[in-house]
């Protein structure tokens, strides 16, 4: 899998990449990662310059949601896509919400927010090789800001973004309290993976201590994340496996 690396090992600071990691591990599919450090390098595999990119049996698969759909087709057991049409629709809505709403709050707080950007530069970007580490942070911040403005989140103030993110956490916690063990029912789905991939990043205290505290204040979310990761014992969280992440491309 082609990805942007994380703080350690083969982890990633990209929720879409983390979502694919989770799906591959859950389905027991062996894989390797290759860490890139610029969209220009990624364009060798995906003309859009976006990760993740999964290379499988001579095919190039792009877009995390499309990759999960294809993994389900090729490796149906254990399933991540429910058979029941109503549950399947709910899981799809949850995944899309995580990808198109929750994710962009995280991007804003990591790249647009001044303190979040400072932490990214000092704790993550300094691992890049010279001279990339001098150039890449500013380029990445401008690209994130531009994308967020087109998407809409970038037009909001930091105060509004943080408030709306908290409301999202409240909605998730409310859904889980006294309800089924997973977001779409009794079984893990691709919707759970999409939300967990974002919240894992937001729970990384080194980079996002404020959002980590917000998650910790909601026991239902903490318990649900633990439940999800209990089914994914070989998935390291964004900074946990202890091995430095070298860029490889």
Task: Please identify what each model-predicted range represents.
Residues 1, 39, 43, 140-145, ...:
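Short alpha-helical hairpin
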Residues 1-133:
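GST-like domain detector, emphasizing the conserved glutathione-binding G-site
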Residues 34-40, 186-188, 239-243:
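Acidic carboxylate-rich catalytic motifs and surrounding loops in phosphoryl-/glycosyl-chemistry enzymes
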Residues 86, 90-93, 160-167, 171, ...:
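A non-catalytic, amphipathic alpha-helix used as a structural packing/dimerization or gating element
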Residues 104-214:
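GST-like fold's C-terminal all-alpha helical module
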Residues 191-249:
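Extended hydrophobic/aromatic segments used for targeting, binding, or gating
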């Amino acid at each position: 899998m082609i990805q942007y690396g994380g703080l350690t090992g083969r982890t990633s600071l990209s929720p879409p990449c983390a979502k694919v990691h989770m799906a591959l591990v859950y389905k027991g599919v062996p894989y390797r990662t290759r860490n890139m450090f610029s969209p220009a390098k990624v364009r060798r595999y995906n003309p859009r310059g976006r990760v993740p990119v999964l290379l499988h049996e001579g095919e190039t698969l792009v877009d995390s949601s499309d990759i999960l759909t294809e993994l389900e087709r090729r490796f149906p057991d254990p399933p991540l896509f429910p058979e029941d049409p109503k549950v399947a629709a709910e899981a799809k809505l949850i995944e899309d919400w995580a990808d198109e709403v929750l994710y962009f709050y995280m991007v804003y707080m990591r790249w647009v927010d001044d303190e979040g950007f400072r932490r990214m530069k000092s704790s993550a970007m300094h691992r890049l090789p010279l001279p990339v580490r001098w150039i890449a942070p500013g380029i990445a911040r401008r690209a994130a800001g531009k994308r967020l403005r087109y998407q809409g989140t970038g037009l909001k103030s930091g105060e509004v973004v943080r408030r709306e993110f908290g409301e999202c956490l409240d909605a998730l916690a409310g859904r889980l309290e006294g309800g089924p063990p997973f977001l779409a029912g009794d079984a893990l789905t691709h919707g759970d993976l999409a939300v967990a991939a974002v919240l894992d990043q937001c729970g990384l205290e080194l980079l996002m201590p404020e959002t980590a505290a917000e998650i910790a204040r909601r026991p239902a979310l903490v318990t649900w994340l633990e439940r999800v990761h209990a089914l994914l014992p070989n998935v390291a969280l964004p900074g946990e496996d202890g091995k430095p992440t070298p860029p490889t491309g």
